[in-house]
Amino acid sequence: EALWESMGKDSTDLDDLIENVAIATVGDVMDLEDENRIFVKEGLQMLKRTKNPGLKALIECTGIDKESLNSYHIGFVLGPCINASGRLDTAKRALKLLRVRTQKEADILAGDLKALNDSRKDMTEEAVKLAKEQVETTDLSDDRVLVIYLPDCHESLAGIVAGRIRECYYKPVFVLTDAEDGAKGSGRSIDGYHMYEELNKCKDILTKFGGHRLAAGLSLEKENIAEFRRRLNENCTLTEEEMKEKVTIDMEMPFLCVTEELVKELELLEPFGKGNTKPIFAARGVTLLGARILGKNRNVLKIKAQDANGSVIEAM
């Protein structure tokens, strides 16, 4: 506020920036606690009626219903479109969208960013496919720490691919790609494996590295990739139990309690995100009564189940 006033501007105009604060907070995966949660909650309301031509165009071209816009749409729809320009081209394109004055130009720029993000998604899917093939058709499958070399993968996608592979196998993952000088890449970890500390043990064969417990970035000479993989696995102390993914539930709930009224009440806890995750409920003694695969892409599962109390529910 002081900075704004020192620029000779009215501090009340700061309210107009709350929608940008919401996008930045969710897009950068900040904890949705305390002031952050308030900023995002208010920013989402502003986004629904935004006057910014660029944001308005991006919301429309991605097919988001303004009235149902929430933190998910920032994190998984709008945010990736804005970030795609920096990943594959130049971040100036996203900045230009946010500063554009005319709706006509905004529509063109928003369409370009969406197309760029669609391209990014296709490239990511191809890289994930190649990474899985490496893991499942080579001796990588025996490793507790996966070091995957994808020479043709765009370096800005290495972290995304590493995260996807970690989800598949629940192992620490490093994805390396070709760089101008050697190889570089990103790592994504699991609980129980401090990625930065493990990299520190290999620092003599790394050109540079940085990170924290759950994620890291690094570069090294290509001829050191095999040695890097060997050392990481030799040093790894993860047990079989630590390599089993754990799901923490908030409470057990019988099917009888799952009502539209409950869903409405849970909406009061929004916005959801890091630091304020969606509650997870579970039921024990569930019997599956039937299941069907639906959808054009055969990627939707519909089930019918019965809990221990005899209540029957359908779910997608």
Predicted ranges, named:
Residues Q103-G111, A115-Y149, K201-M316:
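Mid-to-C-terminal polyanion-binding domains and interfaces
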Residues E5-E223, L294:
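Hydrophobic helix-and-loop "lid/oligomerization" segment in the mid-to-C-terminal part
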